[in-house]
Amino acid sequence: MLELARRGLADLGAAFKLRDIWWALASEDIADSHRRTMLGPIWPLLNYLLFVGTLVLVLGRGESPNFVAYVSTGMLVWLFISDVLTMSANLFSREEGFIKGTVLPISIYVMRQTLVISIRSFYALLGAVAILLYSGFAVTPALLSVLPAVFVLLLAAPAVAVLFGIAGAFFRDFQFIVVNATRLLMFITPIFWTDPGAGGLLGFLYYWNPLTHYIDIIRMPIVDGTIPTNSWTVALSVTALLLASALIALGKFNRRIVFQL
């Protein structure tokens, strides 16, 4: 396993040496996705604002004292996570032309996708900041933990991309499973519902859904001014497991992916 992890690290290192390539490819993806549109990259911002606005109007003030901030931050993180899950499932199939026509490291396509999703999320972030400034939130020392929390989320994203991308390359139905599972996950992840504070199904889903903890390490410092240590423990543990698994999988399958496309 150590040898496989070493190969995975070598592929990742080669991709970072060619970071100008995946930066250029990601920039092209963003430009192409809004080509000949009037609003261009403002669309991700509008989509986010419409989504959050609809939830707040339909659900009212909810059970949280600052429900608007609760939903807006939860939805921001969720949109990033859902993009990572759904786009990763057909990542290498989508990059078939490049993979078959070049000898670039496989990790380049992973980093390209991660950068594209991050740029799109940045536009949504502008909307989240505007909502938070309008609805109000307390400035506390806990806010300092938001940046490292975002870093943890960004570390997990390429690891998921590797694992899901490989699974999707070998099992083409995987992408459809992931799309449908992600739709379900939106409702069993506390994006717009709060901690029930008791047992039952909601309590089980809240505490045992790892996505809860990725959301809470970013959301709780903003909404409650607290640092959720339990969520940090879960998020760091899951991220470490994802990274280790991704490196091993990358080392084992990086040269075999091309033959599955």
Language model segments and positions:
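Hydrophobic transmembrane alpha-helices and immediately adjacent juxtamembrane helices
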Residues: 1-261
